[in-house]
Amino acid sequence: MKFLLAFSLLIPSVVFASSSKFQQVEQDVKAIEVSLSARIGVSVLDTQNGEYWDYNGNQRFPLTSTFKTIACAKLLYDAEQGKVNPNSTVEIKKADLVTYSPVIEKQVGQAITLDDACFATMTTSDNTAANIILSAVGGPKGVTDFLRQIGDKETRLDRIEPDLNEGKLGDLRDTTTPKAIASTLNQLLFGSTLSEASQKKLESWMVNNQVTGNLLRSVLPVKWSIADRSGAGGFGARSITAIVWSEEKKTIIVSIYLAQTEASMAERNDAIVKIGRSIFEVYTSQSR
């Protein structure tokens, strides 16, 4: 599978969707905000026609594990520039293990390639694997500098796992906006930052995500496909960023962020499902 190339569209050149088209989506999001006493941000970018819609798209939300796509994109970029060898290995030490490392915790005393570390963190959200990648790409600062280089002036990474998931209200560290992350994903997967081979690798890691089956994938329209990366953190943070495309190659970029809620994980997951279903309805109803 190969993504539609999106005509090199970036957020500054998009056309804002009519309010009526996403009226039901907005109503659904607002209702969920009230029911969960949450703060929610959503963005949708149609890469076929540049149409864009958001709800609280410029508000900041905790990145949580959605940063992992950017960190691994930075690794791919650095490899293309000859700055790092993705096949180089790192010894796994017990002292380096952090919370939630389902792959790496079984490999203490062994070595792992950077490429395999990206596969682990992108498909299982392994946090120690993410820290291994961060160490290889210049740490949080290296990721933030990379973001600025490709035109993202909002998204920032300041800490490593697991501290970056703290999620305090008003803390600018380790945050993004729904609008900024959509633009960045568009650039990384469809722009000129990465080679086609690197884009395909990044895409495959997202397609093979093993931890999002109960989120957008559970309400994906028939004959549609998805590549995604989710996250969760303190103070009710829950998030997902996704590239979704139809059999006709119609491709949309979706970002959903929740924060500042006491809702359970199950309730937050259900919120993402409901928002996703509402968004998908906009596009499937057009083809009926």
Curated annotation (Swiss-Prot):
PROSITE patterns: BETA_LACTAMASE_A. InterPro entries: Beta-lactam/transpept-like, Beta-lactam_cat, Beta-lactam_class-A, Beta-lactam_class-A_AS. Residues 1-17 form the signal peptide. NCBIfam families: bla_class_A, carbeni_gen, PSE. Hydrolyzes both ticarcillin and oxacillin. Belongs to the class-A beta-lactamase family. The class A beta-lactamase family has a specific amino-acid numbering system, sometimes called Ambler or ABL numbering and often misspelt as Amber. A multiple sequence alignment was used to derive a consensus sequence and then the consensus was numbered taking into account insertions and deletions. This allows use of identical numbers, e.g. for active site residues, despite differences in protein length. UniProt always uses natural numbering of residues, hence there appear to be differences in numbering between this entry and some papers. This is Beta-lactamase CARB-6. It comes from Vibrio cholerae. The gene is carB6.
